[in-house]
Design a protein with these regions (language model features):
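Acceptor/aglycone-binding surface of glycosyltransferases and processive sugar-polymer synthases
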Residues: 51, 55-57, 61-74, 79, ...
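Short, well-formed alpha-helical segments that are part of the catalytic scaffolds
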Residues: 9-23
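Cell-envelope/extracellular polymer assembly enzymes that use nucleotide-activated donors
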Residues: 1-2, 29, 174
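Donor nucleotide-sugar binding loop of glycosyltransferases
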Residues: 10-13, 37, 90
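Short hydrophobic beta-strand elements that form part
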Residues: 2-6, 54
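A conserved acidic beta->alpha catalytic loop
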Residues: 34-42, 87
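Catalytic donor-sugar/metal-binding loop of nucleotide-sugar-dependent glycosyltransferases
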Residues: 142, 164-167, 176-194
């Protein structure tokens, strides 16, 4: 089992993220994909004994994830999970996400699967609702969180994404479309998010909609 952590200038938050995963899952392979960072993110990953894959420049989360999937495919990794480097994902929920792979090919940790305390602004909420609507049209499946960065994958999906994972801004949404188109079963489980430990959040959902349209 491997953790794929795309990281761009996350030197401040990465040490705690790695330490938490190692503490809970000492047998998991941790792969940090340094996406052209300039703050020493790669050095920290190496210091903590992680596999560090370095991009020559910033390609975005999609490009970083594809590299991580290729690494897993080449080494025959059975299952992998995507985990953010900013500290917002709770590693105690990794087991639940991986357990979902017992009857699914891909599992998504949803912030909105049940009534929860995770709040977003009205404009961002509207963007998320629109993305959910578009994905439902294309897949016929109702997803509550199309932009979640907390996901798990079985080996067949890893192999698919190693070759076809989208590298543009809409990677999280398009990944759902690609997996669904290829007949893979995708499921969601509710997860809780934590406050970002460092850095600044992005307007990712608005860029996703712009690219999609």
């Amino acid at each position: 089992t491997a953790a794929i952590i795309p990281a761009f200038n996350e030197a401040e938050s990465l040490p705690n993220v790695i330490s938490e995963i190692k503490g809970l899952f000492p047998d998991h392979l941790i792969i940090v994909v340094d996406d052209g960072s300039t703050d020493g993110t790669a050095d920290i990953a190496k210091e903590f004994g992680c596999v560090c894959l370095s991009m020559p420049f910033n390609l975005g989360i999609g490009g970083a994830l594809r590299l991580g999937f290729r690494y897993c495919m080449d080494r025959g990794i059975d299952c992998a999970y995507q985990f953010d480097a900013d500290g917002q994902h709770d590693p105690t929920q990794i087991s639940s996400l991986l357990s979902e792979l017992e009857h699914s090919d891909m599992a998504v940790g949803s912030r909105f699967a049940t009534d929860c305390s995770y709040e977003v602004g009205q404009s961002r909420k509207a963007a998320m609702n629109f993305l959910r609507f578009l994905v439902r049209i294309y897949t016929g499946q109702r997803f509550t969180d199309t932009s979640s960065g907390f996901r798990a994958f079985r080996n067949p999906v890893i192999k698919l994404f190693a070759k076809e994972y989208p590298v543009e801004y809409m990677d999280s949404v398009e990944a759902l479309l690609i997996a669904s188109k290829n007949g893979f079963k995708i499921s969601e489980i509710p997860v809780k998010m934590r406050e970002r430990s460092a850095g600044q959040p992005s307007n990712r959902n608005f860029r996703l909609i712009y690219y999609f349209l």
